[in-house]
Amino acid sequence: MTRPVALITGGGRGIGAATAKRLAADGYDVLLTYNTSSKPAEMVVDEIRERGDDALAVKVDCANTGEVGLLGIHPWMARGIDVLVLNHGAYDRVAASDMSMEDLRRTMLVNFEGAVAVWKAVQVHLTPHARIVAVGSQLGTRGSPHGADYSASKAALATWARSLAQAVGPEGKRVNILAPGFVDTDILAKDTPEKRKERELQVPLKRVGTPEDMAHTISFLVGNNSSYITGAIIHVNGGLYLP
């Protein structure tokens, strides 16, 4: 029997890499994209293949319409896409009061327009009951003085995804949004030990989240046990932010 296919953007590291491994273990063949570095993505692919599952990494800059267009005609598309995880993103820390229009345009192009572009490119290849997860952020709801452009892009992503959920629900497709809090990814890589401790103390569960925490939630959102959930923003943050 042919295994279902999961497409994960930004699948070479962090939440994307953990999700690729989890969905492969769940029974999916995984097509993941990367942009700046092939090595981490290939390591994820190798790990998945060593377990006897199948995966493939392809270079796609989601802000580049040409590269996104090529993704839309990738040979794996002929199999149909059962799961789409829009996980790619960029976060440059810029004080809200100092944010330039160029900062905003650049971040929106990657985080929001890039996600919509990927959706448009693969839309015709989605299976009738496809499940889509957009990886947003708690900052898309609460905002941030250190990342207004990022917060705005994630707010736009979430609102678009909720609109999409209403549009494609009658077709049998589901769309949900994962909104992580603090997660141990590249975004927090420059934390000093003091800053890390400060973050942990802010979280009621007293720890920073892991990429695997997020991957487990995505696995649930694309699985049968969430079959009546669509258009939801799922906050996974250890109690840090309670909207």
Per-segment meaning from a language model:
Residues 12-13:
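Conserved glycine-rich cofactor-binding loop
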Residues 28-42:
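Conserved glycine-rich Rossmann-like NAD(P)H-binding loop of the short-chain dehydrogenase/reductase
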Residues 95-105, 188, 195, 199:
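Substrate-binding pocket helix/loop in short-chain dehydrogenase/reductase
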Residues 119, 153, 161:
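Active-site helix of classical SDR
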Residues 124-125, 166-170, 227:
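Alpha-helical segment proximal to the catalytic Tyr-Lys
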Residues 137:
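Residue(s) in the substrate-gating loop at a strand-loop-helix junction
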Residues 169, 174, 229-231, 237:
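Short, small/polar-rich loop/turn modules that mediate ligand/substrate recognition or access, typified
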